[in-house]
């Protein structure tokens, strides 16, 4: 199945089925229905992404994993990414906006996010993700309904230019962490320090128990998304 051949009725039927299924079923469905070689997993190695990767390693370890290294991640995030690659042996492909932070800042200046946040995210996140999606028919993400108000109606399968699969959309954070602990899934140590959703180091803060897990991203602004998931 491709985005060109899938219909609205197909997607509704699949979503109805996945509402009562395990996330592994969504990953198997993607592997079996997207053209071989044209499916990827997009991951920044957050908690939900780690559940996806744990399941992927069991179901279809040949599927590539696309990681956007913005050049501004926490050092702990980059170290965690290396541990994950070694732990699961997955085909992790890294996409960057430039060869190094120094090269990026030579082109665009320092602290671009303070001058133009939209441009900063377009250059460091959206453009690298566009490259990762070239030739891709389907991509698996780690988005969930309870992550923020902007995701409360998120379906398991979305139809756009490509098919987007969100295996854990219905899982609350508690279920994600229960799975991580029960299966010894590696996770970023910053989560133990109150960081729930990890983005760029200059733009990310810890959150309180009362807040959405993405409340620490772009604190003090009304922004909820970086722009990657505007890509379909």
Predicted stretch roles:
Residues 1-232:
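Nucleotide-activated chemistry modules centered on ATP-dependent adenylation/adenylyltransferase
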């Amino acid at each position: 199945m491709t985005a060109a051949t899938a219909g609205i009725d197909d997607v509704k039927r699949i979503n109805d089925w996945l509402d009562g299924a395990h996330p592994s079923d969504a990953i198997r469905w993607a592997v079996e229905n997207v053209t071989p070689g044209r499916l990827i997993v997009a991951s920044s190695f957050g908690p939900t992404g780690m559940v996806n990767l744990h399941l992927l390693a069991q179901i279809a370890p040949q599927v590539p994993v696309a990681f956007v290294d913005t050049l501004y991640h926490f050092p702990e995030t980059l170290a965690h990414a290396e541990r994950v690659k070694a732990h699961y042996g997955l085909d992790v492909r890294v996409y960057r906006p430039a060869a190094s932070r120094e090269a990026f800042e030579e082109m665009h200046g320092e602290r671009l996010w303070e001058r133009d946040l939209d441009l900063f995210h377009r250059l460091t996140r959206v453009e690298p993700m566009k490259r990762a999606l070239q030739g891709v028919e389907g991509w698996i993400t780690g988005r969930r309904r309870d992550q923020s108000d902007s995701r409360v109606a998120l379906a398991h399968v979305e139809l756009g230019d490509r098919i987007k699969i969100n295996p854990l959309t219905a899982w609350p954070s508690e279920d994600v962490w229960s799975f991580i602990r029960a299966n010894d899934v590696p996770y970023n140590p910053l989560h133990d320090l109150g960081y729930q959703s990890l983005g760029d180091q200059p733009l990310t803060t810890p959150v309180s128990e009362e807040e959405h897990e993405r409340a620490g991203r772009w604190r003090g602004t009304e922004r909820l998304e970086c722009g990657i998931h505007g890509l379909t």
